[in-house]
Regions:
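Short, structured active-site "lid" loops
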Residues: 55-66
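Generic secondary-structure signature for well-ordered alpha-helical cores
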Residues: 31, 35-36, 59, 87-91, ...
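Glycine-rich phosphate/diphosphate-binding loop of Rossmann-like nucleotide-binding domains
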Residues: 1-41, 45, 238-242
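Glycine-rich beta-strand-to-loop/alpha-helix junction loops that act as flexible
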Residues: 9-11, 66-74, 158, 233-235
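Proline/glycine-rich low-complexity loops and linkers
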Residues: 49-52, 59, 76-179
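An accessory alpha-helical subdomain
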Residues: 152-254
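Structural motif
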Residues: 3-5, 62-63, 127, 138, ...
Length: 257
C-alpha cells in the first residue's frame, strides 16, 4: 500500500486569503485508487521551509503531491526549491508546455512575454505532464530508494483550483502506472442516542478487539448522532466487506440494537 502526503504551498493559504479546496479533491482521487493519505500540510513561500518540509514528507511517504508556488512571479519559488531537492543542475524547455503557453495566451488575446515562456522551463531532473488548463506544467520527480530509504515520487501541481483539479486524472494515471496499489474499503453505521464519549466507553472492549489492520473512526454530528466508520487497507474488496460486516454484527448486541 502506498502512502501519500498532500502539501499546499503559498502565503495566501496561511493568511486565510484563499481557501484550500485542492487537497480534498486530490485526497478523494487517491482514496479511490487505494492510496492512503497520511498527512495534509500547508506552508508558506519560504525556500528553506519548502525544502525541509518536502524532504520530511518524502522520507515518510511514497507519494507527495504539492499544489501552488509554480506561477511566473518572483514570489513563486517552489520550482527552485524542487530543483535543489532533486539535485538539478540546469533547466530545460519543455516543448509541449511551451506550445500550451502560446495557445492559452493567444486564445485570451494576450502577448506571450518572456516571463510566460519561463513557465515551460523545468529542472532537468523531472518529467513533465503537460498542463492543458494553464501555463505551469505538472512536474514529476522520481527518487531512488537510496535517497529517502524507499522509492518516492513528488508531483508538483499548480495551485489554481481549476488547473489542479483538471490535472488530477493525469496524475492518477501516472500513479497507477508506477505504484503497486491495493483496495481501500470503508463502511459506516449510525448510532443514535449516545454522545461520542459515552459511545466510546460503551464499545471499548469491542474496539480493543478489532483486528490490527482495521481502523475505527468516530464521526459525531449533533443533529444525526455518531457515525462509526471501519476501514481496511489491502486485500480484495469482497473479503474486506465481509470482514467489516462481521465486526459490525458483533457490535449490535453490545449496543442492544
Amino acid at each position: 500500500m502506498a502512502n501519500a502526503s498532500i502539501c499546499t504551498i503559498g502565503d495566501e493559504i496561511l493568511i486565510g486569503q484563499i481557501v484550500d479546496t485542492n487537497s480534498s479533491q486530490i485526497s478523494r482521487a487517491l482514496e479511490d485508487i487505494g492510496v492512503k493519505v497520511t498527512r495534509m500540510v500547508s506552508f508558506g513561500d519560504d525556500h528553506d521551509e519548502i525544502i525541509n518540509t518536502l524532504t520530511k514528507e518524502l522520507t515518510s511517504n511514497e507519494i507527495v503531491i504539492t499544489t501552488g508556488g509554480l506561477g511566473p512571479t518572483k514570489d513563486d519559488i517552489t520550482k527552485a526549491a524542487l530543483a535543489e531537492i532533486s539535485g538539478s543542475e540546469s533547466y530545460v524547455v519543455n516543448d509541449g508546455q511551451l506550445k500550451m503557453v502560446h495557445e492559452i495566451l493567444h486564445a485570451r488575446g494576450l502577448d506571450v512575454l518572456d516571463i510566460n515562456k519561463a513557465q515551460a522551463l523545468v529542472p532537468d531532473t523531472c518529467e513533465v505532464i503537460v498542463n492543458h488548463m494553464g501555463t505551469a506544467p505538472i512536474m514529476v520527480f522520481r527518487f531512488p530508494v537510496e535517497r529517502f530509504g524507499h522509492e518516492a515520487t513528488l508531483y508538483a501541481m499548480p495551485g489554481v483550483p481549476f488547473e489542479a483539479i483538471g490535472a488530477i486524472p493525469d496524475v492518477i494515471k501516472d500513479i497507477k502506472a508506477h505504484e503497486s496499489l491495493t483496495d481501500i474499503f470503508h463502511k459506516c453505521v449510525m448510532v443514535f442516542g449516545l454522545a461520542e464519549s459515552a459511545l466510546s466507553k460503551e464499545i471499548e472492549s469491542w474496539e480493543d478487539s478489532l483486528p490490527e489492520d482495521m481502523h475505527l473512526a468516530y464521526l459525531p454530528n449533533p443533529l444525526t448522532g455518531v457515525r462509526l466508520r471501519l476501514s481496511i487497507y489491502g486485500g480484495s474488496r469482497e473479503e474486506e466487506e465481509r470482514r467489516i460486516d462481521e465486526e459490525f454484527a458483533r457490535l449490535k448486541p453490545i449496543l442492544g440494537r
